C-alpha cells in the first residue's frame, strides 16, 4: 500500500457520446466526431472512460489515472497501447508516451 495518492491530480475530463459497450475504467478511442468506443489491442487510446450514463461518458484525457494492465510496465516514462481488454500494455512500436508512477501485477497509475 502506498503512502501517497496521485488520484485526480491534474485531471482533465471531457464529455463524449458513447456506445453501450463503453464501461467505466476502460481505455477508449475516438470512433467518430465527438464519440468514443472501446479500443482493440494495440490501439492508441484517447483516455479512460468514467461511468457512462444515457449514451454519454466523461473521459479523463489528462492527469493521473489508475488503469488495468496486461504484462508489466516499467516505472518512469513508457510507451503504452490498449491491450484489447480495456487496459493497457507496453508498446514496442510506438503507443502513447505516459509517466508510470506506480505499477503492480494487474494495474498501474499513469500520468496521461
Give, region by region, the residue ranges found by the protein language model.
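Surface-exposed, low-hydrophobicity beta-strand/loop segments enriched in small/polar/acidic residues
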Residues: 1-112
Amino acid at each position: 500500500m502506498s503512502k501517497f495518492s496521485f488520484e485526480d491530480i491534474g485531471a482533465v475530463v471531457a464529455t463524449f457520446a458513447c456506445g453501450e459497450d463503453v464501461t467505466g475504467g476502460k481505455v477508449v478511442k475516438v470512433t467518430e466526431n465527438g464519440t468514443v468506443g472501446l479500443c482493440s489491442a494495440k490501439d492508441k487510446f484517447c483516455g479512460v472512460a468514467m461511468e457512462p450514463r444515457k449514451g454519454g461518458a466523461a473521459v479523463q484525457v489528462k492527469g493521473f489515472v489508475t488503469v488495468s494492465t496486461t504484462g508489466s510496465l516499467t516505472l518512469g516514462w513508457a510507451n503504452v497501447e490498449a491491450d484489447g481488454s480495456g487496459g493497457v500494455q507496453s508498446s514496442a512500436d510506438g503507443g502513447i508516451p505516459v509517466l508510470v508512477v506506480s505499477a503492480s501485477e494487474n494495474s498501474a497509475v499513469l500520468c496521461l
